[in-house]
């Protein structure tokens, strides 16, 4: 990754030989973005998208080497504020577009060295792994980075030695759908096999079943992309365990988490799959220069002002980009907003719905508590000294099928024996009008027993909640799970690796909706959970008993400190005085507070369920 300077001559970028630790991720700015944000009221430019007019770094706009404007804020329904710093052209003269041919020519030497080095990497990985895997494939998303990754790969490898795979989430921008169609035809013309994978559910169905995805409850990528792709490739190219190299357009500068990726890794997404990121160290400057130099397809969404192309409604999307999305695709965005409000259990009367959507309240849910669902958990554990008693809504043989992924199950004359890691437990089941009961011999608090309870809860989650999203099928590294016609089958070849049981809460659907009604019934549960408590607030209050963070945060802080026993009616208690003397730098202070917090509804629920 190279540093760059602004080039007044071309209005573009000029790479230099200095290495840059962190890119500012520059991107070209076309007239459509200027129109959407309202710059057309102040600047004169032709409505021509054959070339950009300027560049942006985050919210700052650069024209021929000068910062001429910036934007602030913006929400789903409110345009960002424009801050005009200086006139791009004197006396209102028309803006001059970036001279792309000259910019490309001036960057040729440095860019070509980077490109050739990347092509060699791809070829060397191919040589090293071609006898170890069933297939090489480029994971294509329709974004600029995957366009570049694909072009690099097709230059490095024979066209019959890799596939292109598009995971259709049914939530893409319309511009992505258009680009994928063009790219598919181009691949066909060049002898490259282009494949598409999709979930057996539409996005409308999945959002209504799982509830809208959130930052901490992101079922969407697995259900709509990763699992369908792995299952499709396994069915098509593998006889048993799939071994493959997935070539991506992932770049380290896209996010903090991606900056920690290794260029080559094994099993990070799915077991049996190597992930190779050939352009991991490329910056967006190099990406755009390569696209322009090769005349590659560019998703029109970038011309509207997006720095990344993903789904129409994403919990990780910024407020500014949500505004642009709604300006570009109003009907689609409003459709997803309706799904969000229809599934929320919050009071969204009056202006509450608009505020909820504008502030991204839907993005912060941690469980099913905030969803409009009306059922208790379908299984519960009541532990006695003699038995682990699992009550279930409906007793079916499905739990015995899933138990085969955990250990051996034997039935003889009504007696059930369960084996886990060479330890056998007696089991019995019964059923009445209220549901079913599975009683398992309690063998104490050994490591084996703790693991047994954890994994058996996953077995019950699958048996009670499975909606056949097929994530478990994809998670099995040996392809020993199959689902068809509403039935789950576990092969006798299952090696009990437990990968399928380690899915969040045992089942993505259960993980998304769990705790819905049970948590709604707990008074005081929402005193501080939806906003969260900053430890610095507590530290500051203990240092200065008059400290308040302001607005709703103050209520949240006092709610937490009331539960912790520090204050009562916003006045310091004797316990609070003790904590003040000890100070929050003493870990014992927090331990004592947690002793009090353990009796509150939120912490009670966490202790018993998590």
Which role does the model predict for each range below?
Residues 2-286, 290:
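ATP-dependent adenylation/nucleotidyltransferase module used to activate substrates
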Residues 331-347, 490-505, 514-519:
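Short microdomains enriched in Cys/His and/or Lys/Arg
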Residues 284, 293-300:
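Extended serine/threonine-enriched, polar tracts that run as long, contiguous segments within proteins
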Residues 1-94, 98, 299, 304-458:
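ATP/NTP-dependent adenylation/nucleotidyl-transfer catalytic domains that generate, transfer
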Residues 254, 259, 263-282, 418-474:
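A broadly conserved sequence feature marking short terminus-proximal activation segments
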Residues 514-610:
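Donor-sugar nucleotide-binding helix/loop cap in glycosyltransferases
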Residues 471-487, 499-513:
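Iron-sulfur cluster-binding cysteine motifs and their immediate structural context
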Residues 303-306, 482-493, 497:
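Short linker/helix segments within small regulatory modules
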